[in-house]
Design a protein with these regions (language model features):
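Residues forming the flavin
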Residues: 2-609, 760
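Residues forming anionic-ligand binding surfaces in small-molecule and nucleic-acid pockets
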Residues: 198, 290, 539, 649-665, ...
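A short, contiguous, amphipathic alpha-helix enriched in charged residues
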Residues: 38-48, 675-692, 773, 777-782
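Short acidic-hydrophobic surface loop/beta-edge motif
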Residues: 19-21, 72, 254, 625-626, ...
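Well-ordered mid-protein domain cores that form the structural environment of catalytic cofactors
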Residues: 690-721, 726-742
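Acidic, proline/glycine-enriched N-terminal capping motif
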Residues: 548, 564, 571-703, 708-710
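Conserved, structured C-terminal
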Residues: 615, 619-620, 633, 719-721, ...
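Structural motif
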Residues: 23, 74-76, 628, 705, ...
Length: 998
C-alpha cells in the first residue's frame, strides 16, 4: 500500500519502523513517530468523524491540543477509550480506532439529516422546542435527546490499567519546551536552580521543529536538541515530555498529567499508563506558546480546511502533505511560511491575503519563489462535502464590507491563518487578571497574582530574538534570587526575517443571496448566525452567550473559537473587546482521564475491613451485610424469601412491640481521661459539661470552626476524671483527629489524654417495651428500674460473670439500653442476650430497621448532618450554650445562619398514605409552576413507618417551623414522581419522649 501524501526524506519520523493500524475496520500503515492524524492524512484519509449537532463531515483542523473535532474511539489491549484526539494520539503497532457520532458509518451517517433541518435547530432550540406537551418529556423528548447526546462511548468494563500520583517540589517549573521554555530552563539550571520542564508533546522544541531560523550557528531544531540533551544530563533538572500541565491552583500548586504508556501497544508490567503530578514551585514560568486563529467563511468546517500552522507541522515533522493543490488564506505572514514550505517540496500553493499591500522579507521570498499571491482577496466559501474540491473567492474592499466578483478556483485544501492567540489559560487560572492587547488583537496576561511569569508567544511576543533574550534573562534572574548564585550564560544571536503587520480582519461577510454556515465552534456546530440569535434574544453577558449557544463548551474548550466569538459579539454590540470580556478559564486545560485523577484509589482500600466480634453469629443467622465506613454491619436478617423492605419492616415492628437487639460495636468510642477532661468537652461541645454527675450521660453536638455540625453523640462520665465518648460510625476517626489537633496545637496546656477504644468494646443495643424485663434477667444483681437506672444513666453490672457497662440511651424512640463488654466477650454477650430474650420474642435488627426507628423518632443522623447544616437546621438550637464559648460559636452569628427563614428538619407524609417518597427529592409549592421551579427543600431520609403503617420522611425545608401543617409537593425527576404531601413534626412517634423515659 502506497502513501500518496507522504514525502520522502522529509520529517522527523522513524521510517525504519513501519506500524500497521486500523481505522474504521480498514488496515493502514504509518511509522514510528506518527500521530494517528498524520498517518491517516498520509494514507489519504481526510474524513474522520461527524459534528455534534448537524452531523456534518469533519476532518483535521489542527495538529495537537488545538484540534477541535478529530476525535475517535480508541481500542487498545482489549480496552476502549472515548473522545481521543487523533492529533495527539501517537501511533503504535496494532492501534485500532473508529469514528464517533455517526451511524451506520462515517461515510453514510443517518444523523446528517439534521443538516437539512438546521433552520429548525438554531442556538437555544432545545429551550424552546421540547416544552409542549409536558407529558412528552419523559416518554419521548428526554430518551431521544439522551440517545442523540455524547460522542464516544465510555467503557463499562473495569479499567485494568494502573495509574499513579506523584508529588514534587522545585525552584522553577517551566511549562512548555519551545524557544522561551528551553532558554529559561537552560539559564536557570546553569545557575543551580532545581528545574522541572514539562512538554505536552512527545518532541521537545515547540515551533523550532518547524522553523528554518538559525540560533547562533545552529538550526533551530539542532539548538533545541542540544539544549535538551544538556538539560537531561543535569542532576538538578527534571525533563518531562508527554506531560500536560492542566491546572494552576493556590500557593503555586500545579497539576500535570503525564502520559507514560499511551503511545505503546501495551503497558509494561508494573508500569502505570498515566501519572498525575502535584507540583509545588517557588516560581512558575509559563511558556505555553500560542494557538493559530482561524478565519471565518462559508463552509469553513469542510474536511480539508485546516490551520496553516498545522499544515506546516504535518509537512515538516511528519513528512505529510495535507493536499496537493493548497490554497493559503491568511491575514498575516504566517500563511506565507506555510506556502514557502509547500513550494520547497514541489507543491504550488496559491495565497489569498486580506491585506492590500503588505511588505516584508517573508513575502519577498514567496514572490521570488514564484508563488501566486492574490492581495485583498478572501475565501467566500469552501466547496465540497466530504473533502474540499474548490473555493469561491473574491476581492474585498478596503473597508472589508464589499465583495467583488466571485471566482471559483480548484483546490484540495484550504490552510487558514488569522494570526495568533496567546495560550493564557494557566496564567488566568493562577488569578492573573488578563488584559487585551490592541497590537495582537488578543488577551495577554496582566499583573501576576502568584509567583508566575509568562514568556514568549504566550505573552504576545512573536519575535524569536526578543523571546530568547527575555527568557534567558528571566531564568537567570529567578535562579539568582533562589540560589544566590551568579552564573550567567550568554544567549546566541538570532537573525530572523521581519514580518508585516497583520490585518485585523477575521470574518468574511456573506455575499447577497447566500446563506452559508460560517462556523466558530467546529465541534458543537456554533455558527455566526447562532451568536447573532443569542444577542438578538437579549443575551449580553459573554458567559450567557457561551451557555446559550454552547460556544467553547466542546471537548476542546474553545481553543480556536473563543476569541473569534468575542470579536463577533464586540462587532455586533459595537463594543470594544475588553468591554465584552472573556469567559472563565477553568482547569483542566485539556481532558484528563478519570483513571489518572483517581490514581491508585481503586477497589477496596488497604485498610482492613472491620468486623464486630459477633460477625460469625450474624453470618450464621442469614445477615445481609452492608458497608458502613470501614465496617461490615448487618443490614437485615433474612428469613425465607424476604426482601430488604419486608425484613427490615418485620424487625422494626418487633422493636416497637417486643424487644430487639442491634450490634452497635461500630460506633466510635473514645476514652477521655485527665483533670481537664471536662474542660475539653466543654470547649468542643456546644452545651455545658462542667457539672455532669458521675454515672450520667449527656447528648452533645460538635461543630466545625465554620459553625457546621461535625458530629453528634453521647458522652458518659465514668468517674471523676474519666469520660466515655461515643461518635457516629462514619465520623469516629475524624472526631479523634479533631480532639487530638486541638489538644496538641491549640490547647496544649490542657492536662487530658484521648484514645480510641472502638475496638476494645463490643456493644449491643437492646430496645423495645420489653427491654427492661430482658435487662433485669441479664443482670439480676443490678437495679435497672427507672429509679436505679434512669434515662441517660450509667451503671456497671455482671453479665453471667463478665463485667459490663450499661448505658440507658435510646436511638429508636423506645425504652432502650446499650450494653458494652470487652471485645473478647462480645459473642458471649450476644448469645446470652438472644438466649434469655427468647421468652420476650427478641429478634436481632440491622441498620435498615435502625434507620426506620430513628426516622420515626426524628433523630438526626448522617443524611441530615451532611456537612451543610447548622444546629438550628436540625432542631438542636437548645443545645447551644449562651454562657460559654465553644468551637464554631462565632460562625453561628453569620447573616445566613441567623436568617428568619432558615431551613429546618421537618416530617413529610404523603397525602394518600401510600406512595413512598424517594430520598433526595425536592419539595416545591406548586408542581405545575414554570421552570425553574423554586426548591423549598429536599428529602433527607425516608422509611415506611411501622407505627402508623404509611410512608414517612424527614426533610430539610426552608422556614420549616412555619411550614408544619401545610401541603406541598415532592418532585423526583429521576423517579418521575410528583407526590402531594403534608408537612408534619419531625417527631412522628412519641413526640413527648415518654417511651424513652418510661
Amino acid at each position: 500500500m502506497t502513501q500518496n501524501f507522504r514525502l520522502e526524506n522529509v520529517g522527523l519520523i522513524n521510517r525504519n519502523k513501519k506500524l500497521s493500524f486500523k481505522f474504521n475496520g480498514k488496515v493502514y500503515y504509518g511509522y514510528e513517530g506518527d500521530t494517528l492524524a498524520s498517518a491517516l492524512i498520509a494514507n489519504g484519509v481526510h474524513l474522520i468523524g461527524r459534528s455534534f449537532k448537524y452531523h456534518r463531515p469533519r476532518g483535521f483542523f489542527g495538529a495537537g491540543v488545538d484540534e477541535p473535532y478529530a476525535i475517535v474511539q480508541l481500542f487498545r489491549n482489549g480496552e476502549t477509550e472515548p473522545n481521543i484526539k487523533a492529533t495527539e494520539q501517537e501511533l503504535f503497532e496494532g492501534l485500532e480506532a473508529k469514528s464517533v457520532n455517526c451511524w451506520p458509518s462515517v461515510n453514510f451517517d443517518i444523523g446528517a439529516i439534521n443538516n437539512f433541518l438546521k433552520i429548525f435547530l438554531p442556538a437555544g432550540f432545545y429551550y424552546k422546542t421540547f416544552m409542549w406537551p409536558k407529558s412528552f418529556w419523559y416518554r419521548i423528548y428526554e430518551p431521544f435527546i439522551r440517545k442523540a447526546a455524547g460522542l464516544g462511548v465510555a467503557s463499562i468494563e473495569h479499567d485494568k490499567e494502573r495509574y499513579e500520583h506523584k508529588y514534587e517540589y522545585c525552584d522553577l517549573l517551566i511549562v512548555g519546551s519551545g524557544p522561551s521554555g528551553l532558554a529559561s530552563a537552560y539559564s536557570a539550571a546553569k545557575n543551580g536552580a532545581r528545574v522541572i520542564l514539562a512538554e505536552d508533546k512527545s518532541r521537545f522544541g515547540g515551533t523550532l521543529l518547524t522553523s528554518d531560523v538559525n540560533i547562533g550557528n545552529e538550526k533551530g531544531k539542532e539548538w533545541a536538541d542540544r539544549i535538551i540533551s544538556e538539560l537531561k544530563e543535569m542532576p538538578n533538572v527534571t525533563v518531562k515530555n508527554r506531560s500536560q500541565v492542566f491546572g494552576y491552583y493556590d500557593h503555586n500548586m500545579l497539576v500535570m498529567s503525564e502520559r507514560i504508556s499511551d503511545h505503546l501497544p501495551k503497558t509494561k508490567k508494573f508500569h502505570p499508563k498515566q501519572r498525575l503530578w502535584y507540583m509545588r514551585a517557588k516560581e512558575v514560568l509559563i511558556s505555553s506558546g500560542s494557538i493559530e486563529r482561524p478565519l471565518v467563511f462559508g463552509n469553513n468546517d469542510t474536511p480539508g480546511v485546516m490551520l496553516s500552522s498545522a499544515a506546516k507541522e504535518y509537512l515538516k515533522v511528519y513528512g505529510v502533505l495535507v493536499g496537493k493543490k493548497p490554497l493559503i488564506f491568511t491575514n498575516n505572514d504566517s500563511g506565507y511560511e506555510t506556502a514557502i514550505e509547500f513550494k520547497k517540496n514541489g507543491i504550488d500553493p496559491i495565497i489569498l491575503d486580506t491585506r492590500k499591500n503588505p511588505q516584508s522579507e517573508i513575502i519577498d521570498e514567496a514572490k521570488n519563489l514564484g508563488i501566486n499571491i492574490k492581495l485583498s482577496y478572501v475565501v467566500i466559501a469552501a466547496q465540497g462535502y466530504k473533502k474540499v474540491k474548490s473555493a469561491d473567492i473574491a476581492k474585498i474592499s478596503d473597508d472589508k464590507e464589499q465583495l467583488g466578483t466571485i471566482e471559483n478556483i480548484k483546490c484540495d485544501c484550504i490552510c487558514v491563518s488569522g494570526f495568533w492567540t496567546p495560550t493564557i489559560h494557566l496564567a488566568s487560572q493562577s488569578g492573573n487578571k488578563t488584559k487585551f492587547s490592541e497590537d495582537i488583537d488578543a488577551f495577554v496576561p496582566g499583573k501576576s497574582k502568584q509567583n508566575e511569569k509568562t514568556l514568549g508567544a504566550a505573552n504576545g511576543v512573536y519575535t524569536l530574538d526578543e523571546t530568547l533574550k527575555s527568557s534567558f534573562e528571566t531564568g537567570y534572574e529567578i535562579s539568582k534570587q533562589i540560589t544566590k548564585n551568579d552564573n550567567k550564560v550568554s544567549f546566541p544571536n538570532v537573525v530572523e526575517k521581519k514580518s508585516a503587520v497583520h490585518d485585523k480582519f477575521w470574518c468574511v461577510p456573506l455575499p447577497k443571496g447566500k446563506n452559508y454556515k460560517r462556523f466558530l465552534d467546529f465541534q458543537n456546530d456554533v455558527a455566526v448566525s447562532d451568536i447573532e440569535i443569542a444577542l438578538r434574544e437579549g443575551y449580553r453577558s459573554i458567559e450567557h452567550v457561551k451557555r446559550y449557544t454552547t460556544l467553547g463548551m466542546a471537548t476542546d474548550q474553545g481553543k480556536t473559537s473563543n476569541l473569534n466569538g468575542l470579536q463577533l459579539v464586540s462587532k455586533i454590540e459595537n463594543k470594544v473587546v475588553p468591554a465584552v470580556g472573556h469567559t472563565t478559564f477553568r482547569p483542566p486545560y485539556t481532558p484528563v482521564s478519570i483513571g489518572a485523577i483517581v490514581g491508585r484509589e481503586v477497589g477496596k482500600h488497604s485498610k482492613p475491613t472491620r468486623k464486630s466480634p459477633m460477625h460469625s453469629w450474624h453470618e450464621k443467622h442469614n445477615a445481609v451485610f452492608v458497608d458502613a465506613g470501614v465496617w461490615l454491619r448487618p443490614r437485615y436478617y433474612k428469613r425465607g424469601d424476604e426482601n430488604l423492605f419486608e425484613g427490615s419492616k418485620r424487625e422494626a415492628k418487633n422493636v416497637r412491640t417486643n424487644v430487639g437487639v442491634c450490634d452497635v460495636t461500630t460506633l466510635g468510642k473514645i476514652d477521655i481521661k485527665g483533670p481537664d477532661a471536662a474542660e475539653l468537652l466543654n470547649r468542643v461541645y456546644t452545651n455545658a459539661w462542667l457539672k455532669l454527675p458521675i454515672g450520667k450521660a449527656r447528648y452533645g453536638v460538635m461543630l466545625r470552626e465554620d459553625g457546621i455540625v461535625m458530629d453528634d453523640g453521647t458522652t458518659t462520665r465514668i468517674s471523676e476524671n474519666h469520660y466515655h465518648m461515643t461518635t457516629t460510625t462514619a465520623q469516629a476517626a475524624n472526631v479523634l483527629s479533631h480532639l487530638e489537633y486541638y489538644l496538641q496545637l491549640v490547647w496544649p496546656n490542657l492536662n487530658v489524654n484521648v484514645v480510641s477504644t472502638t475496638e476494645q468494646w463490643a456493644g449491643a443495643a437492646i430496645a423495645g417495651p420489653k427491654s427492661r424485663d430482658l435487662l433485669q434477667k441479664l443482670f439480676p444483681k443490678s437495679d435497672v428500674s427507672n429509679e436505679g437506672l434512669p434515662f441517660m444513666g450509667y451503671i456497671e453490672g455482671d453479665l453471667f460473670g463478665v463485667k459490663a457497662r450499661i448505658f440507658r440511651i435510646s436511638f429508636s424512640g423506645e425504652l432502650a439500653y446499650e450494653v458494652n463488654v470487652e471485645s473478647d466477650n462480645g459473642n458471649f454477650m450476644w448469645e446470652k442476650i438472644m438466649e434469655v430474650g427468647e421468652e420476650f420474642k427478641i429478634q436481632p435488627y440491622g441498620t435498615e430497621a435502625l434507620s426506620t426507628l430513628r426516622i420515626e423518632m426524628g433523630h438526626v443522623a448522617g443524611s441530615e448532618l451532611d456537612g451543610r447544616t447548622i444546629p438550628y437546621d436540625n432542631s438542636l438550637e437548645g443545645l447551644l450554650s449562651k454562657k460559654k464559648d465553644f468551637i464554631g460559636k462565632r460562625s453561628l452569628s453569620r447573616e445566613a445562619f441567623t436568617a428568619e427563614d432558615r431551613q429546618k428538619v421537618v416530617g413529610v407524609v404523603p397525602l394518600d398514605k401510600k406512595t413512598s417518597i424517594p430520598e433526595g427529592s425536592h419539595l416545591v409549592k406548586d408542581s405545575n409552576a414554570p421552570l425553574p421551579n423554586p426548591k423549598l427543600g429536599y428529602i433527607s431520609a425516608s422509611c415506611w413507618s411501622v407505627e402508623y403503617d404509611n410512608p414517612f420522611s424527614l426533610a430539610i425545608l426552608k422556614d420549616g417551623k412555619k411550614m408544619i401543617g401545610q401541603k406541598l409537593f415532592v418532585m423526583s425527576p429521576l423517579k418521575n414522581k410528583v407526590i402531594p404531601v403534608e408537612i408534619v413534626s419531625s417527631h412522628y412517634v412519641d413526640p413527648k419522649g415518654e417511651r424513652v423515659r418510661s
